[in-house]
Amino acid sequence: MCLPFFTSINSSGLFKAVSWRIIESFLLELFFIFYSSFSWSSSLSSSEGTGAGTGTGTGTGTGTGTGTGTGTGTGTGTGTGTGTGTGTGTGTGTGTGTGTGTGTGTGTGTGTGTGTGTGTGTGTGTGTGTGTGTGTGTIWEGELVFFYAECKGYPKIKGVFWVVSFFYDTAKNV
């Protein structure tokens, strides 16, 4: 649908031509205000989302430990000894003697012990995750200006409207 055709200019005066151009610009701006007040002005949309994911990983580790233990043992030994003695006697007499002896013995024993130790280990793991996101966008009003100029049939004005509306929409939507 095109706006009213206000281009039939009377060649008798330049003032009327300029006045009609001002009126057309004003009506076009009113049309944009009316157009933007409805929800269907956002017929174009874009989506951009970010998501966070969770993952699981497995790892292996090595550790070292030290321990101390105590043990008790029992042993048995045998020994041998030799002795010498001297004695004197008279008639029916009595004698006394002394002797000395030495002996050696050996023994063996067994024992048990317990100990405790500590160790540390390190491991690595990998995980994957997925995420979703949503976004919204607005329609580019420059397309409406282009359509309006196309209906008017003015190639030069169409180009000017297209450039101006592009910068206008870009600055407004930043």
Swiss-Prot record:
Chain residue ranges for the region called Disordered: 46-134
Originating species: Acetabularia acetabulum (Mermaid's wine glass)
Key words, A-Z: Biological rhythms, Chloroplast, Plastid, Repeat
Where along the chain is composition biased (Gly residues)? Answer: 50-134
Q: Which GO terms describe its cellular component?
A: chloroplast
Start-end of each sequence repeat = 49-50, 51-52, 53-54, 55-56, 57-58, 59-60, 61-62, 63-64, 65-66, 67-68, 69-70, 71-72, 73-74, 75-76, 77-78, 79-80, 81-82, 83-84, 85-86, 87-88, 89-90, 91-92, 93-94, 95-96, 97-98, 99-100, 101-102, 103-104, 105-106, 107-108, 109-110, 111-112, 113-114, 115-116, 117-118, 119-120, 121-122, 123-124, 125-126, 127-128, 129-130, 131-132, 133-134, 135-136, 137-138
Which region ranges are annotated with the description 45 X 2 AA tandem repeats of G-[TA]? 49-138
**PANTHER family in the record:** FIBROIN HEAVY CHAIN FIB-H LIKE PROTEIN (PTHR37612), PER-HEXAMER REPEAT PROTEIN 5-RELATED (PTHR37612:SF20)
Instruction: Indicate what this protein is called per its UniProt record.
Output: Period clock protein
> Which BP terms does GO give this entry?
rhythmic process
InterPro entries for the chain: Diverse_Func_Domain-Protein
State where the protein is found.
Plastid, Chloroplast
Is Cytoplasm given among the entry's keywords?
A: no
Chief subcellular location equals plastid
